[in-house]
Amino acid sequence: MTVLASNDPPTAVLNAEQIMGLLPHRYPFALVDRVLEHVPGERAVALKNVTFNEPQFQGHFPGRPLMPGVLIVEAMAQVGGLIVTQMPDLPKGLFVFAGIDGVRFRRPVVPGDQLRITCELLSLKRKRFGKVKAEATVDGQLVCSGELMFSLVD
């Protein structure tokens, strides 16, 4: 496990190219830019840089761009997917986002923000169903939290 001290600059444990080798998502749905911490089967911490030239900001909302909540949740799910999909001794296949519980949005996310997403595995059942606790922060302030479920599709 690699962990950064709080005063260290964010350096990548996994860079964008390595992330693309682990997750099936591609532009415009590749929402993980850098992984800072990755312990398969336990925990992951990653960054999503929110930029004005992302396609959703053309219509959400003109004159006041806000990152859609569903994309914040999707970014959290992708980080959670890094935990579940990289566990040893799991059957091969595609883990898909299967549900959410208790998701709350605390503040808006706008272009220029950097989401820091932390996910921790809560449970894994029958090597097919996983649940993670997820939190997204901007500048140390909580913007979104909840529990995300994953299911293995053969």
UniProtKB/Swiss-Prot annotation:
Pfam families in UniProt: FabA (PF07977)
Active-site residues, as the UniProt record annotates them: 60
Keyword Lyase: yes
GO CC terms, sorted: cytoplasm; membrane
Signal sequence segment: none
Keywords: Cytoplasm, Lipid A biosynthesis, Lipid biosynthesis, Lipid metabolism, Lyase
Cell compartment(s), UniProt: Cytoplasm
One Gene Ontology MF term: (3R)-hydroxyacyl-[acyl-carrier-protein] dehydratase activity
Catalyzed chemical reaction(s): a (3R)-hydroxyacyl-[ACP] = a (2E)-enoyl-[ACP] + H2O
CDD domains xrefs: FabZ
EC numbers for this chain: 4.2.1.59
GO biological process: fatty acid biosynthetic process; lipid A biosynthetic process
InterPro entries given in the database record: FabA_FabZ, FabZ, HotDog_dom_sf
Gene3D superfamilies: Hotdog Thioesterase (3.10.129.10)
HAMAP family from the UniProt entry: FabZ
Function: Involved in unsaturated fatty acids biosynthesis. Catalyzes the dehydration of short chain beta-hydroxyacyl-ACPs and long chain saturated and unsaturated beta-hydroxyacyl-ACPs.
Protein family membership: Belongs to the thioester dehydratase family. FabZ subfamily.
Protein name: 3-hydroxyacyl-[acyl-carrier-protein] dehydratase FabZ
Lineage of origin: Bacteria, Bacillati, Cyanobacteriota, Cyanophyceae, Synechococcales
Gene name for this UniProt entry: fabZ
